[in-house]
């Protein structure tokens, strides 16, 4: 791997330097010393490391002749969103920002999706989930439940890029075991540090990255997962009664996010195998991704837009599983009371602990 090689101290995580006076590697932060030979193993691990390379097969296909005859493109002049609907679509508001949309012409100029997960839940289920989402929220203004107005509920097929890849991983973790004891004068803490290595290969299928810039990535990730066993070859018939968001983030521009998700999952999966320690953290990782493929899919999402006191609130529900997410307003008065109550409880608990310690000393 190109760049500067840096050794980290397993005790404090500081950068280790070579000390010419002692001819050893020394941490300038905690003064721990290491023989140079002990670091040769690290060099061997990195010697053959190569930069990550990933080639993706082109997703999506071409539309058959006449397949898009009944599809039309609508655009929002406010947020720039583009959606696709059939002749039966009666939408007049943008599902992303709530502003009016206009018909701009016959649908054209986009890849044909490879897969689609049809809607399993209807509009009635989305309304019920919203009411369920409001329950048990102690800091939610009481009048919000009755005064919030649902401006739009729209079933939208959101574009997703699905990435497959294999990950060859070499990871090194720093793990610790801590032992504490006391005598009549002092309290002692002994911490032992261990270097743990894991090697292996993981396969990833259908890692989703949404292809729409109009919907927050965090919002879409929050309603995951989608059950891929329900994904079927795309047919335009499934768009009837719904709208489909046109992708405006290409597969190529989505690769970086896919790589980050795959790398993060790889590190977490291998870290879960390092057991029997009090703490474990990643010290170094070399992950090579290969065999990459990408597919273009449409996933079902219910978008609910509500307004209250001049503010708009957007909620999303997984149209397959019913998972529901969305931000809610906070009652500032209730929040202050809750914080005061929490502060009082913590103060009382601290006083109680101090009183018990004082009582233990006099006894």
Label for each model-derived stretch:
Residues 2-4, 35-71, 105-132:
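Intrinsically disordered, low-complexity segments
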Residues 111-307, 358-363:
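Charged, low-complexity helical/coil segments in non-catalytic cytosolic or luminal regions
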């Amino acid at each position: 791997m190109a760049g500067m090689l840096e050794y980290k101290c397993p005790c404090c995580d500081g950068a280790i330097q070579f000390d010419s006076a002692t001819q050893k590697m020394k941490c300038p932060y905690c003064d721990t010393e290491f023989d140079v030979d002990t670091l040769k193993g690290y060099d061997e691990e990195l010697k053959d490391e190569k930069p990550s390379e990933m080639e993706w097969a082109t997703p999506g296909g071409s539309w058959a002749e006449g397949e898009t005859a009944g599809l039309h493109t609508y655009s929002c002049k406010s947020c720039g969103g583009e959606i696709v609907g059939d002749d039966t679509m009666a939408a007049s508001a943008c599902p992303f920002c709530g502003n009016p949309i206009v018909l701009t012409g016959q649908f054209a100029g986009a890849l044909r999706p490879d897969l689609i997960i049809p809607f399993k839940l209807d509009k009635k289920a989305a309304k019920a989930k919203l009411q369920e989402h409001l329950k048990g929220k102690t800091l939610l203004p009481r009048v919000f439940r009755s005064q919030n107005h649902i401006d739009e509920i729209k079933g939208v097929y959101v574009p997703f890029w699905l990435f497959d890849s294999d990950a060859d991983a070499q990871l090194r973790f720093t793990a610790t075991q801590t032992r504490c004891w006391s005598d009549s004068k002092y309290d002692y803490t002994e911490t032992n540090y261990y270097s743990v290595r894991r090697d292996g290969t993981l396969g990833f299928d259908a890692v989703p990255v949404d292809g729409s810039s109009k919907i927050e990535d965090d919002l879409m990730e929050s309603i995951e997962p989608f059950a891929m066993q329900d994904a079927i070859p795309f047919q335009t018939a499934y768009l009837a009664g719904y709208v489909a968001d046109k992708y405006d983030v290409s597969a190529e521009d989505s690769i970086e996010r896919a790589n980050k998700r795959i790398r993060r999952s790889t590190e977490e999966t291998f870290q879960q195998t390092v057991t029997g320690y009090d703490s474990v953290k990643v010290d170094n990782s070399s992950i090579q991704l290969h065999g990459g493929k990408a597919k273009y899919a449409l996933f079902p999402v219910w978008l609910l837009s509500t307004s209250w006191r001049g503010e708009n609130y957007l909620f999303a529900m997984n149209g397959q599983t019913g998972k529901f997410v969305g931000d809610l307003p906070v009652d500032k008065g209730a929040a202050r009371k809750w914080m005061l109550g929490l502060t009082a409880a913590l103060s009382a608990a601290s006083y109680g602990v101090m009183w018990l310690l004082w009582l233990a000393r006099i006894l």
